Amino acid sequence: MSDGLAERMKLYESAEAGRRLMPLLPALARLDGRAFGSFTRNLARPFDERLSRLMIETCVTLVTETGSTVGYTQSDEITLAWVPEAFDSQIFFDGRVQKMCSGLAALATAHFARRLPAFLPTEFAERVPTFDCRVWNVPTLEEAANVLVWRELDATKNSIAMAARAHYPHAAVHGKSGAEMQELLFQKGVNWNDYPAFFKRGTYVRRLKEARPFTASELEALPPKHAARANPALVVERIACAPEELPPIVRVTNRAGVLFRGEAPRADFT
């Protein structure tokens, strides 16, 4: 009876928990800070660079730990993309939807909370920031790139609104277009274009190959007979995950190649 019970319970569980993303298709995840409006109370407006740097570091950690091809962060959200190379390519948690959602949310929350005291005062460390997550497939690389276009355009729209609200009461900017809010900012002597790129458009994080010699600490940790012991100039190829400044991605004509294949951007500024 116990075997039958176990099988039946597993059947119930797997009916939903066993769902996987489709192989070969690009996979996306988006994480959002939960109730960050309350969490960020009393921080500098329209943005606090300390919080922005912590979000970028959290994004770097997620790209590093999950093997995602590219990451993107703006405000209190992070987007990740995986581009499978073959049918049996492994992505995070083998594409299991519920495990990806719970694992990514837990990883982001744990890193953010652990590093929070290094970036923000003690009063913020006593709060409990958390992230939620959703994952999905898109049919093509171009659509995967368009997800990031969507998020970058959202970042631009939100940054204009946040800048305007930092200088005007809500009623003065309610219902105004982006151009109208920028005009209001000009009246206060503020040029939205002068804000840093991470606030206006967000930040991309990519996995890039780099060839470099071992560092002193890496050399120390090598086995005694390793070739680099005799030749410290020996170059090693590694994968590094780091922020990368890109032109506005909506203007990049080969954006899928730039984001997922490491191509140099070709931008249309007409």
Protein language model regions, located:
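Regulatory and interdomain segments flanking nucleotide-handling catalytic cores
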Residues: 1-270
